[in-house]
A protein has these predicted regions:
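Short, small/polar-rich loop/turn modules that mediate ligand/substrate recognition or access, typified
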Residues: 150-154, 232-234
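Alpha-helical segment proximal to the catalytic Tyr-Lys
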Residues: 103, 146-151
Length: 247
């Protein structure tokens, strides 16, 4: 199941669904639902159950809580509306989704729940009082859920740093300048001529290095979803190229 919020993402979701079905021989479903609303997570689970329970049996094996927003402002500029939006999507959304999905999790510890946190929960990036706080809450919930759901699923979080995509592109020059020192000293964020895209190599001259590729972060998610990760729960697994070695 692929969740998206805005109608503008419908075609992208459809294209991704077709690609996954063709490549892996699986069934997919795109569901439009706003996880930042009280009813959104429950509606999402209901839609998935209706679509995939034609045989009578229904089970949710893997959940990746990836929805998130980042609204960066220093203390004097923080607005209550920004706080509410961020915590509704980043904190309340995952909680309500797990609440709605819990009845359908396995009963043999084989389930996998992966929460997307951020290095911001630990690094104290300037301008991320709200975002960093929301991701720290996600890490706290990860540990709680690991205990409450111990007979149903493992629950872990990963904490990426900058990742190539729309959220990274939306960062201001001021914010990028503020994290440049971190990037310069992150081992795997060094841009490589002839390996990384030319525009990333060029951007690294001012930003300090390149962001992670989505595939690099997804690989760690996949690892935690595997049977080999069955003895790992309640952990925050680094997925940031070594950025938190500075912490």
């Amino acid at each position: 199941m692929l969740n998206y919020t805005s109608a503008s993402s419908a075609s992208l979701t459809s294209d991704l669904s077709k690609s996954l079905e063709s490549k892996h021989g699986i069934k997919t479903l795109g569901v439009q639902a706003d996880l930042g609303t009280p009813q959104g997570p429950a509606d999402l689970v209901a839609a998935v159950k209706q679509h995939f329970s034609d045989s009578g049996a229904f089970q949710i094996d893997i959940i990746v809580n990836n929805a998130g927003v980042a609204l960066n402002n220093k203390i004097p500029e923080v607005q209550v509306s920004e706080f509410e939006t961020t915590y509704k999507v980043n904190v309340l959304g995952p909680l309500l989704l797990i609440q709605a999905a819990q009845p359908y999790l396995p009963n043999d510890r084989s389930g996998r729940i992966i929460n997307l946190s951020s290095v911001s929960s630990s690094t104290g990036f300037i301008g991320q009082s709200v975002y960093g706080g929301s991701k720290a809450a996600v890490e706290a919930m990860t540990r709680t859920w690991a205990r409450e759901l111990s007979e149903r699923a493992t629950v872990n979080a990963i904490n990426p740093g900058p990742v190539l995509g729309p959220m990274y592109a939306a960062n201001t020059d001021e914010f990028k300048a503020g994290i440049k020192g971190w990037i310069e000293h992150t081992p795997l964020m060094r841009a490589r001529q002839g390996i990384d895209a030319d525009e990333l190599v060029e951007d690294a001259k001012t930003s300090g290095g390149r962001p992670a590729y989505t595939s690099e972060v997804a690989g760690i998610v996949g690892m935690l979803c595997s049977e080999d990760a069955a003895w790992c729960t309640g952990q925050v697994v680094c997925a940031n190229g070594g950025m938190l070695m500075l912490h």
